[in-house]
Amino acid sequence: MYLYRYRKRPNFGDELNDYLWPRFIRTPLESEPGSDDVLVGIGTLLNERLPAHGTLHVLGTGYGYGDLPTEDAMRRSKVHFVRGPITAKALGLDPAFAISDPGILLHRTEDLNRKKDIDCAFMPHHGLCHDRMKQLCEQAGVHFIHPEAPCEAVIDQIGRSRKLICSAMHGAIAAEALRVPWLPVITSTEIVPDKWRDWATSLEIEVSFRKLPTIWSPPEPSVKGRLVAWAKGAVFQRRLSTLARSRHFRLGTDHRLTNRLTRMEHTLDAFNRTE
């Protein structure tokens, strides 16, 4: 079975496909197309760019980043579950298909009792991770988690944190799974709030974003560009430090998480019996 996922650059959310699926799916997964069966898994992949051939098994995927899937793609699809109610509504599915993002399965695979030696961490969206942002985090007294680091390293750092500030959605999903309170922030126009609400609504969590300045690296070479970068960096550092001390962190209920995990596992068990 071909595992269809975003592969152009490493990113925690996309890499979770290779980390999680072998633990829950019995069918061997391939990284190159060619199989008659396609697993469409973790990520915002339900759009017009779905593979043109094969049976598409949709397991927790979200809609976005383009137009709706073509009629041909939908005819070839076996939807087992999707990321949330926004995706289900967009595709005209019964709301019962909106279970959650498969990233919550980390609750089943990971040590939930890691030593908490990180007070507060920050995990940016993968399009905005660089040394300048890491430096600003350190100056704010906040631990920086690189979203392109290996899955095991990201999971370990989130699990060791008492709190997580994040503009990376799968950072929040991992934190929820590991029972680490999290706070969502918008750091650029690349952040898509509806993706977050799609997943969060599946766990009955209300998402309210705080804002941080967009930090580019390197700054524009002109004197004005360097001054603007310095000013934005100072604001970023100050706001991040304030957020780290705030009471706005959230965590869904154990009951709702357990309910979604149980439904997801039952669906995956049924999938394994038929493949």
Where in the sequence are the language-model features?
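Active-site anion-handling motifs in enzyme catalytic cores
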Residues: 1-275
